[in-house]
Curated annotation (Swiss-Prot):
<keyword id="KW-0150">Chloroplast</keyword>
<comment type="similarity">
    <text>Belongs to the universal ribosomal protein uS2 family.</text>
</comment>
<keyword id="KW-0689">Ribosomal protein</keyword>
<keyword id="KW-0934">Plastid</keyword>
<dbReference type="InterPro" id="IPR018130">
    <property type="entry name" value="Ribosomal_uS2_CS"/>
</dbReference>
<dbReference type="GO" id="GO:0003735">
    <property type="term" value="F:structural constituent of ribosome"/>
</dbReference>
<protein>
    <recommendedName>
        <fullName>Small ribosomal subunit protein uS2c</fullName>
    </recommendedName>
</protein>
<dbReference type="GO" id="GO:0009507">
    <property type="term" value="C:chloroplast"/>
</dbReference>
<dbReference type="GO" id="GO:0006412">
    <property type="term" value="P:translation"/>
</dbReference>
<dbReference type="InterPro" id="IPR005706">
    <property type="entry name" value="Ribosomal_uS2_bac/mit/plastid"/>
</dbReference>
<dbReference type="GO" id="GO:0005763">
    <property type="term" value="C:mitochondrial small ribosomal subunit"/>
</dbReference>
<dbReference type="InterPro" id="IPR001865">
    <property type="entry name" value="Ribosomal_uS2"/>
</dbReference>
<dbReference type="Pfam" id="PF00318">
    <property type="entry name" value="Ribosomal_S2"/>
</dbReference>
<keyword id="KW-0687">Ribonucleoprotein</keyword>
<dbReference type="InterPro" id="IPR023591">
    <property type="entry name" value="Ribosomal_uS2_flav_dom_sf"/>
</dbReference>
């Protein structure tokens, strides 16, 4: 994996609040190597370590994107939903930003069936077929389509398991991480001071509660993905 420069600087991370962890009573001892200090009862993340692992993650996704690999971004916090969707669309990644259904990856055959139903319903709606149905039947199909759009809209073009999964909140997306571990899918995860850094292939120590922190980390990753995709397109 070739190392590159991703313009990751400490001042920018401090301004985004990336260094603020949880209260010292909530910490996970496994995060000790990534903590630099305690301040007013709160752990402070070592931003030099953050920069190192974020840079490694950017190198990984750049290389993968330059080879045409696929990505899935998972972030189901309500406040982060729009950010996840816009970042994923911008970098042409799949995403889940509402709810992670257990078995979404490990029961891929079932997920594929649901996606097929979703695509069929979308096509029928676009062709105006709902207008030719009884009102009650049309209403039922519209509700079903709305539900599928809400929960599967971000993966509607996903035809196979992703090559890399990016997780924005380890504790909230624990099931997604477990499914990736079972399937051997490489993962990148933000880890706050109350997390377990051993659960992902690359753990980026960072504040996973503040939007400015999440946005900064995610933007660096999707920029690297976009750069890699551009290289892939040029070399085809």
């Amino acid at each position: 994996m070739t190392r590159r420069y991703w313009n990751i600087n400490l001042k920018e991370m401090i301004e985004a609040g990336v260094h603020f962890g949880h209260g010292i009573k909530k910490w996970n001892p496994k995060m000790a190597p990534y903590i630099s200090a305690k301040r007013k009862g709160t752990h402070i993340t070592n931003l030099a370590r953050t920069a190192r692992f974020l840079s490694e993650a950017c190198d990984l996704v750049f290389d993968a994107a330059s080879q045409g690999k696929s990505f899935l971004i998972v972030g189901t916090k309500k406040r982060a939903a729009d950010l996840v969707a816009s970042a994923a669309i911008r970098s042409r990644c799949h995403y889940v930003n509402k709810k992670w259904f257990s078995g979404m990856l490990t029961n891929w055959s079932i997920t594929k069936t649901r996606l097929s139903q979703f695509r069929d319903l979308r096509a029928e709606e676009k062709m105006g077929k709902f207008h030719h149905l009884p009102k009650r039947d049309a209403a039922i199909l519209k509700r079903k389509l709305s539900t599928l759009q809400r929960y599967l809209g971000g993966i509607k073009y996903m035809t196979r398991l992703p090559d890399i999964v990016i997780v924005l909140d380890q504790q909230k997306e624990y099931i997604a991480l477990r499914e990736c571990a079972i399937l051997g899918i490489p993962t990148i995860s933000l880890v706050d001071t109350n997390c377990d850094p051993d659960l992902a292939n690359i753990s980026i120590p960072a504040n996973d509660d503040t939007m400015t922190s999440i946005r900064l980390i995610l933007n660096k990753l999707v920029f690297a993905i976009s750069e890699g995709r551009s290289l892939y397109i040029r070399n085809r």
